[in-house]
Amino acid sequence: MTDTRDDTPADDEPGSDTPGLACVLDFNANDPSGSGGLTGDVLAMGSVGAHSLPVVTGSYARDTSGIHDFYAFDEDAVGEQARTIAEDVPVQVIKVGFLGSPENIALIAELADDYDGVPVVAYMPNLSWWEDEKIDDYLDAFRELMLPQTSVLVGHHSTLRRWLLPDWEGERYPSPRDIARAASEQGVPYVLVTGVPLPEQHIDNVLATPETVVVHEKFERIEAVFAGAGDTLSAALAALLATGMDLPEATREALVYLDRCLDEGFRPGMGQVIPDRLFWAQPEEAEHEEDGEPEGSLSPGNDYFEVPFNETKH
């Protein structure tokens, strides 16, 4: 018998006209350990109320102790993934993680330029595991091609200062504003600098422009070696911007989310600690019961983070 059913959703069916979750076009590598990469991005974005559109740029060969090798995808494969989904789904924010090769950087920078007006959150990881020549080629391409498309550059203080200010000769370390000034020479308006050392076992995390400090949040240093913290933070920031939160508030919320992820971190193998991006989904501890909190009082997404929907402001 002929099947005459129409697969097109009716107007009154769920999902037919509802806006749904804000979507982030997410470029990053596969990480088999789940420490970072696309796995971490998807979990972090979902936890704060956005939907990741993950585009695989390659794959690490790694365990929880460290990265042993990387296999980059061909730029044609990366481009086909991105264009196919972007032609179907409206994109609120583009998130850039590790792209794997100068060729992929060139392609993704061109794509970001085609989406003029869509914010780009770019994260620069520590690349010390890689070969020196590949590091230099990658950083040069990222500086020349990707930074001019970047709205917010995210990275650890030591990583960004060595990259953007290699000839720094001051008696003090460069400040976040110094780093922001260097990034602004390539067109980056905001830099989120993490891990700025402070006295008494604290660290500062600073959203800065060349002219001013926009946000700074101090946290107590956690005595553990983590993998995936930078991916978690940049993914959460991109997702919160996609939902409509303005940049200063999104930065604060992303930092608080990261702190909770690290505080609840776990060690699945013999190496580093992994952020628990789903801390809110774990069973309530006895201490919460003693405090009189009802079971299940901590929940994810827009209600928890009080995120207005889809009104991104820079």
Task: Give the ranges of each region predicted by the language model.
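Charged C-terminal helix
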Residues: 21, 72, 248-314
